[in-house]
Regions:
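Histidine- and aromatic-rich ligand-binding microenvironments
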Residues: 7, 40-41, 96-97, 118-119, ...
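Acidic, PIN/NYN-like endoribonuclease modules and their adjacent C-terminal/linker elements
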Residues: 3, 30, 104-135
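Active-site-proximal, substrate-binding regions of enzyme catalytic domains
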Residues: 53-75
Length: 135
């Protein structure tokens, strides 16, 4: 089984029952889980945690038997920094935060697919990254 890193936007769609994206995200998660191992890292965990008051509630929403938790390799952290620097040099917005670069670099370094709705940024910064996106 291969691994799929699940971006926080997909998890939040389902958790918050987002009117526009919950159905797509839920279906995508189910399809990926049939053949692959769903994974998150500490950055994704932190981004999703914003919607929870208690860690116990977050833990219940992301059970370890359904979602594997992976550390971010130092190689991915280095790549994230370099890609972010390149993005800024190309005129990228200061509003763009480093977490997305950690997520993309982690998937790239460990040769995982990335399940996300934010295709444009990941494609521009990590062109070889295999994405699972809407449409």
């Amino acid at each position: 089984m291969s691994r799929v890193l699940v971006d926080s936007n997909v998890l939040l769609d389902v958790i918050t029952e987002d009117q526009r994206w919950a159905q797509w995200s839920s279906t995508a998660l189910e399809r990926c889980a049939e053949e692959d191992v769903l994974c998150i890292n500490p950055v994704i965990y932190a981004e999703v945690s914003i919607g929870f008051e208690r860690i116990e509630d977050l833990e219940a929403a992301l059970p370890t038997d359904l979602v594997e938790r992976l550390p971010i390799p130092y190689e991915a952290a280095f790549l994230a920094g370099k890609c972010f620097l390149d993005y800024r040099r190309r005129g990228g917005s200061r509003k763009s935060t480093l977490p997305d670069f950690f997520i993309g670099a982690h998937a790239a370094v460990q040769d995982m697919q990335l399940l996300t709705r934010d295709a444009a940024r990941y494609r521009s910064c990590f062109p070889k990254l295999r994405l699972i996106t809407p449409g």
